[in-house]
């Protein structure tokens, strides 16, 4: 009985405490105001952007959400209901929603799971039920839910609460968790939202974009139809990267099954940018029915000649073979900074994450009071027992130290300090070593990203992360297609490349990529005689054996069910007889 009750409780928890809105079966596609306009939004811009989404061909390509980010709201009325900013939206939000719907589009809004939004407008914490009621009344289709001013309350409390309130309205609303990747959100968010941010905010630069997709990649196993890893919105068209880099940006988001939310001014978009954003074959990979997130399967470190030493860059930290380059030189300073090559980049815990977090180098801001934790996320101590220990305070009172991730054995993260977290710091050559390898900012490399598609096909993106031209190669045995012939198609050029027996290689310029779709060429089976009478007899024997075995399994299952039912009834009858006996004794 206890086992049965436990099973019922688990089933009830899954059924009644999960997101069940039927949305997000494929990564969402649309446009968002934030990356380009920040708070500079108004109803004219939104109206014009609805028109532009249609006239530019973006809707035909699959983009169907128009999403207002922060600053559409102002404060609350006396009853606690959210009010729109009537200075910038004098006619309110509902007319814009109706206009979008009349054009076949969907409409989204933004809030934060805190007292305030990130720009200081009224947040939704403690007002979840009222806000969900308003969103449903306005016929909203999408909610981006941020993480600012959260009072230190766990995301596992705040985000499910809004989910439940949205569900209670009976109005399907796509629920996008903008939670910055904290508290290992990817491991639990599929029961809460339709997508979840795995990282901090993106900016319009190559370094930011490539570091963010690296961080997103580690969670690839948790994405799939109904819920997606979100490395933030697209920066394509905002001017901070080259067209080549934007093409790679789009390819990486597509193969990673990331949400495709345009972040540029679509009312003033160049043909080159539109060509990237509307590439139908890239988008088809992103929207593939299988919904399997592609991920990094191969990384080849570039072996530069001794006389070439690339400049250090803001990036994740990793453990690599020692080579004496600047990327492997570190200075531990009295102010707590751990500086790469003693320059302006410091080892940083992004967003002061309180759980195990991948660390990176970031612009030094030691002592800056306006940064999270008053910049303690960039302060470290090299202890007597050879640990690199963060000066940040953690809720459990325990300290965190740098260590190498157990899954990758190369990526460096914070973790509870223990005996395995030791590092050797050499004050002469300024290397920091673990197990004979050197701590480094992520060195330049070539990579292959890949993933399965529906109908047995395969997607591959070959990438050159280096600042110099490089050759990138992939062998079929590295992706499980030993002794196979693959038919390859270039998705950018939208043309077939032919058949390749063992491998494929390509020379790529700096930050360029080639996006491929691969299909296995099946060998033509040799001609054989049709099955004769003896073969038919053998086939019938096999079929009979299978049917007998299947019947036995079904009979066992039915027997178990009947047994559990009889046992349950006997238990109840026994309880009833005992109750009747007690009543009779009391009456006597």
Language-model segments: what does each one mean?
Residues 296-445:
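Lectin-like carbohydrate-binding module/patch detector with strong preference for beta-trefoil
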